[in-house]
């Protein structure tokens, strides 16, 4: 890793936001939401679908599943996985 500490959560959310990746978000109460992240901060995520936006608090999120595979970092040159 380089000098900057990578925050996986922010890296993931920024990647799916920039690529407009459709996500399925499961909340802790079992509700399933789908849409595209248009904005996020330390406490919440703005999810957009069919022209409507939903502000979702991160503490209510259980799982985030992208519709397609996401590669956040380049594979290391030494051949190690993970």
From Swiss-Prot:
Keywords: RNA-binding, Stress response. PANTHER family: RNA-BINDING PROTEIN HFQ (PTHR34772:SF1). One of its GO terms (molecular function) is RNA binding. RNA chaperone that binds small regulatory RNA (sRNAs) and mRNAs to facilitate mRNA translational regulation in response to envelope stress, environmental stress and changes in metabolite concentrations. Also binds with high specificity to tRNAs. HAMAP family: Hfq (MF_00436). NCBIfam families: Hfq (TIGR02383), PRK00395.1 (NF001602). Disulfide bonds: none annotated. One of its GO terms (cellular component) is cytosol. Homohexamer. It comes from the Bacteria. It comes from Parvibaculum lavamentivorans (strain DS-1 / DSM 13023 / NCIMB 13966). This is RNA-binding protein Hfq. One of its GO terms (biological process) is regulation of RNA stability. InterPro entries: Hfq, LSM_dom_sf, Sm. Residues 10-70 form the Sm domain. Belongs to the Hfq family.
């Amino acid at each position: 890793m380089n000098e900057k500490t990578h925050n996986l959560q922010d890296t993931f959310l920024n990647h799916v936001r920039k690529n407009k990746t459709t996500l399925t978000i499961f909340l802790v109460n079992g509700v399933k939401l789908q849409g595209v992240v248009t904005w996020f901060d330390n406490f919440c995520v703005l999810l957009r679908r069919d022209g409507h936006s939903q502000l979702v608090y991160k503490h209510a999120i259980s799982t985030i599943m992208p519709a397609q595979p996401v590669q956040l970092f380049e594979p290391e040159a030494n051949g190690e996985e993970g």
